[in-house]
Amino acid sequence: MIPYFLLSILGLIVVYSTTSATLIEEGKSAFQLVRNQGIFWIASLILIALIYKLKLGFLRNGRLIFIVMIVEMVLLALARLVGTPVNGAYGWISVGPVTIQPAEYLKIIIIWYLAHRFSKQQDEIAVYDFQVLTQNQWLPRAFNDWRFVLLVLIGSLGIFPDLGNATILVLVALIMYTVSGIAYRWFSTILALLAGSSMLVLSVIRFVGVEKFSQIPVFGYVAKRFSAFFNPFNDLAGAGHQLANSYYAMVNGGWFGLGLGNSIEKRGYLPEAHTDFVFSIVIEEFGFVGASMILALLFFLILRIILVGIRAKDPFNSMVAIGVGGMILVQVFVNIGGISGLIPSTGVTFPFLSQGGNSLLVLSVAIAFVLNIDASEKRAKLIREYEGQTSVTL
């Protein structure tokens, strides 16, 4: 919990630093967004306390998972039909002063869903080969999960479009399949298909041209991201403006940064400085040394979560914990890849540091599940040791 508290408090500081100047210029309170973030953090702490005390056996109920996923699908549909567009993408539902982003919650639901399915079918997954899987009735029972995940991902990308969360969902699902005990040849086949598909899409976009690709109604928003990725300096006043200023922010920071609150780029130059590109401002203010220390703390948290999964004896617990660790790890790499130009910018927030109550709630709930799993596994270990000692005595 210590890394979680440190990162959450640091997140509040960063949110204030990246938003206060702009809010003051707009005639608003400098504490408006950090206050909202603080409210979500308090709600997150309450959820963590409640989830930690629960017995998580009910999570293995297939009917409950089905109901939750139906509710999620309804929320996703509502987000597209009546949601508020942000930067060309739909995915937010406004309920009074609160804004709900259903796609954020889909990440933890996918982990829960796949952990439940594969924890019940590990033996079958490990022994079936490609030929049997394509002919046997077992396929719809387990690998229908993969089809369902793909359907959700394609729908998310095509309907909103939400390239960032779609990318995270693909990679998290891949991690879940990896830890499920799937045969290596199946894993390598899926990985090769994903890599090949990604290269094909990039090649087609490059060959056809971003301008023509952007004329497709569904992919206009995505095309702008790819345009900036290929060469942000070709359109500094348009699609490349955000990425180019991200570069400037990181260069300004140098080794030790300009100091907390002294960022230049956050003062109207770098759009979304408090969300997608918050880590660029972190580098500008704390420098590469300070940013590296923050990453080290975050990776320490991820490692602890993954170790809980590795040590867990229960397959369901193991896959949930590793899935949560993988989710945070993927989100970090996708965000840093986007702000540094290694991959197209996808609108993914940086864990704990970006302003966004939905993201913080999802991270907190996920960590609460891991804390509960860790405690239950330790209790189970003590029971096994006690029973072992009792049997030896008898």
PLM regions: where:
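Membrane-helix boundary/helix-loop-helix interface segments in multi-pass membrane proteins
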Residues: M1, L7, I13-F160, I336, ...
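Hydrophobic alpha-helical segments of polytopic membrane proteins
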Residues: L64-I67, R147-G155, L163-S214
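Hydrophobic, glycine- and aromatic-enriched re-entrant/interface helices and adjoining loop segments
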Residues: V86, L191-F288
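Alpha-helical transmembrane segments of multi-pass membrane proteins
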Residues: W41-S44, Y105-A115, L169-A173, A296-F299, ...
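Structural signal for the C-terminal ends of transmembrane alpha-helices
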Residues: I46-G57, L114-D123, L174-A183, F300-G309, ...
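Hydrophobic alpha-helical transmembrane segments
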Residues: I39-L47, E285-I305
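Interfacial segments of multi-pass membrane proteins
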Residues: T167-W186, I264-G287, G347-L361
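Loop-to-helix entry and N-terminal half of a specific, functionally important transmembrane alpha helix
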Residues: L307-T346, L353
